[in-house]
């Protein structure tokens, strides 16, 4: 899978549609499809039914080589994988890409899941890598809320009720990932039951969900703090952490899609000053480096 942005995207597109009635039937079909996708997450990645879903491969989060995964990744073997040739390093600087050791583990997981026939009833518990990512869950929460609101508008009451229920439970459970010490949300290693001490942008992305205002304010302050150490907002990892790498993919560099979602969440929380800084920095980054 990939981050579940579809519910948010569909509602945003529908709101901007010049003639909603013309596309209503198509939108209803998409609402049904996204509702089934959301159900898949909670059925297959939330075995304890606590409202938080796990990723079982770093690729699913879209933040492939984040520091967030290092601890849990140590449990993934590298022995016995098939020979492979990487294509990504042929068109990108290898120093900017995940390491060979990380790729070995990526592929071990893929081959392991394939050996299980991609049976979703088995994959979660069979994976040595089970991480609850606050950013991933925030996206799912936001998409559930947005899909529910859209379904309500279209009088698809069952879909609306179901997605509101998922979103509210998940939003409440998201608080289990908050760290007063780190002043942000952290990933949870579901195998050990421990929070992962990694100050990544994944914990800041929680503001994309409608978290309570005090938490949003704390994240805005945290973003201001870590961005002060960089030329542009928002680094994908805390520059004060020794594991920060300014050039390597998700261990330091700025990602505009993350800036977009965090900015959207800050605007929704009426934190205009913080969101304006992110927009200004993003535009300056595009101006200096291209898009």
Model-derived regions: residue spans:
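Short, flexible helix-adjacent loops and helix caps
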Residues: 15-19, 46, 152-156, 179, ...
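Well-ordered alpha-helical scaffold segments within catalytic/enzyme domains
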Residues: 5-22, 138-157, 205-215, 259-274
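Aromatic- and histidine-enriched alpha-helix N-cap/loop-to-helix transition segments
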Residues: 1-8, 29-33, 131-143, 198-201, ...
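Extended, well-ordered alpha-helical scaffold segments
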Residues: 21-41, 143, 147, 154-174, ...
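Internal, well-ordered domain-core segments that constitute the primary functional module
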Residues: 2-75
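Short amphipathic alpha-helical segments
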Residues: 257-261, 273-281, 290
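Extended amphipathic secondary-structure runs
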Residues: 113-159
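Extended glycan-interaction surfaces of carbohydrate-active proteins
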Residues: 1, 50-132, 169-254, 287-291
């Amino acid at each position: 899978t990939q981050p579940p942005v579809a519910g948010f995207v569909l509602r945003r597109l529908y709101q901007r549609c010049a003639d909603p009635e013309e596309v209503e039937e198509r939108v209803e079909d998409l609402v049904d499809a996204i509702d089934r996708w959301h159900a898949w997450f909670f059925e297959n990645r939330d075995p304890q039914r606590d409202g938080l879903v796990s990723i079982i491969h770093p690729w699913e989060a879209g933040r492939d080589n984040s520091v967030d995964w290092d601890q849990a990744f140590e449990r993934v073997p590298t022995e016995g994988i098939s020979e492979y040739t990487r294509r990504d390093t042929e068109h990108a600087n290898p120093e900017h890409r995940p390491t060979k050791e990380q790729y070995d583990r990526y592929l071990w997981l893929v081959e392991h899941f394939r050996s299980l026939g991609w049976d979703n009833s088995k994959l979660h518990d069979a994976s040595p890598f089970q991480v609850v990512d606050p950013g991933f869950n925030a996206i799912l929460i936001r998409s559930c809320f947005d899909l529910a609101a859209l379904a309500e508008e279209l009088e698809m009451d069952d879909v609306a009720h179901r997605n509101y229920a998922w979103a509210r439970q998940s939003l409440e459970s998201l608080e289990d990932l908050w760290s007063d010490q780190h002043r942000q949300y952290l990933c949870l290693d579901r195998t050990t039951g421990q929070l992962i001490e990694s100050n990544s942008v994944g914990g800041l992305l929680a503001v994309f969900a409608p978290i309570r205002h005090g938490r949003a304010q704390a994240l805005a302050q945290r973003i201001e703090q870590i961005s002060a150490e960089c030329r542009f907002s928002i680094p994908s990892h805390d520059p004060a952490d020794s594991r920060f790498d300014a050039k390597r993919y998700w261990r330091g560099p700025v990602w505009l899609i993350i800036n977009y979602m965090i900015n959207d969440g800050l605007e929704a929380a009426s934190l205009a000053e913080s969101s304006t800084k992110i927009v200004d920095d993003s535009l300056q980054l595009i101006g200096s480096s291209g898009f």
